[in-house]
Amino acid sequence: MPSLKDIRNRIGSVKSTQKITSAMKMVAASKLRRAQEQAEAGRPFADRMARMLASLAANVSGATGGPRLMTGTGSDQVHLLVVVTSDRGLCGGFNSTIVREARRTIKRLTGEGRTVKLLCVGRKGRDLLRREYAGMIVHSFEDVGRRRLSFADADRITAKVLELFEAGEFDVATVIYNKFRSAITQVVTAQQVIPFAPAVATEPAETAEAKPLYEFEPNEEKILAELLPRNLAVQVYSALLESAASEQGARMTAMDNATRNAGDMIKKLTLVYNRTRQASITKELIEIISGAEAV
């Protein structure tokens, strides 16, 4: 049985941990509000951008085929997975769910005879995937949005993806990230970004009479060639915003659970301490009484 001093020390240690987790919960809650506002504000723009490009792509003549970012390379042999995780831990299953989905996708694609390459955003995902798939990682980004997430962060990632695409390093690119729903709910999402798929976001159905007629200057293909790289950056930025909000929500929930568990442990240890102390006092009384009777 542990001594009273040992139990007191353990209670003190758990209380210190509880203070830390409680403080981290409050910090995460503060960051979550800002990250959630950014993610929700960015959704309409990203959705509208995708719908506009889908509508524009529908007008491109099939004769020329359109830009490669829309038509692809004509093959789907090599897949690039952009895996978005965090740089820090203590956020529950936030990173493990993304890595699990990445592993599942890798196994499915390799099982079909495809080649897979990885671009990791976030230290945690890179470290976990490197254990099994070190040879697949072509590039990684750390400290993305460390101070404050900005469009420049998405631009850096997009520039690397486009560089790899133009070099013929892959045929299809998919971003895997956590989409924010609430502080306790994050949905793992796999979104194909190259080639651009108009079917993923289309304008609401319109009658022939109501459908407007547009005249494009310059032609649709040139406009698409300019807008598709920008749309890629927008979609990457949207994924980063969703991931940032999901990370803070997961961290707040994890720290809240840790704080509650610490409170329960303190109660149990206090009960053990009181029982041990009571047993010690009772033992001393018995010894005193026994000694008095012996006299």
Curated annotation (Swiss-Prot):
GO terms for molecular function: ATP binding; proton-transporting ATP synthase activity, rotational mechanism. Keywords: ATP synthesis, Cell inner membrane, Cell membrane, CF(1), Hydrogen ion transport, Ion transport, Membrane, Transport. GO terms for cellular component: plasma membrane; proton-transporting ATP synthase complex. It is found in: Cell inner membrane. The keyword ATP-binding does not apply. GO terms for biological process: proton motive force-driven plasma membrane ATP synthesis. It is a peripheral membrane protein. It comes from the Bacteria. F-type ATPases have 2 components, CF(1) - the catalytic core - and CF(0) - the membrane proton channel. CF(1) has five subunits: alpha(3), beta(3), gamma(1), delta(1), epsilon(1). CF(0) has three main subunits: a, b and c. Belongs to the ATPase gamma chain family. Produces ATP from ADP in the presence of a proton gradient across the membrane. The gamma chain is believed to be important in regulating ATPase activity and the flow of protons through the CF(0) complex. This is ATP synthase gamma chain. It comes from Rhodospirillum centenum (strain ATCC 51521 / SW). The gene is atpG.
